[in-house]
Amino acid sequence: MMIPKELVKGSLKSIVLKLLAENKRMYGYEITQKVEELSEGKIKLTFGALYPILHKLESDGIVITEAEVINNRNRIYYMLTEKGNASAKERIRELEEFLQTIKILLNPQSGLENVFAKS
């Protein structure tokens, strides 16, 4: 079952940052394939969704690009800057906190058990 686009949309930037943090250097098609692979086909990241994110990250100084010619084709690789590495860590932390909060909202009783378990 595919995850609805509306649920994925707000998390795409975090997903891209996480992949770049783990893989150091990736090109667009590679990112789309990795998302599909890791999500077991539940998330399909389109180029129309990916490239605006990558371009915004680049204009914000979070990623830099490197062009390489492979089989007579220009391939653009994306890499995190130092600022990008810090941003990736922060975005991932925020997303994890958000997901934990959603989990509590969906199952309030479970959330209370977790709060008491930490005490």
Task: Name each model-derived stretch.
Residues M1-G10, R91:
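Intrinsically disordered, low-complexity serine/threonine- and proline-rich regulatory segments
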Residues G61:
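Glycine-centered, phosphate/nucleic-acid-interacting loop/turn motifs that mediate DNA/RNA or nucleotide
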Residues T65:
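Short beta-strand "wing" residues that participate in macromolecule-binding interfaces
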Residues A86-S119:
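Amphipathic alpha-helical dimerization/coiled-coil segments
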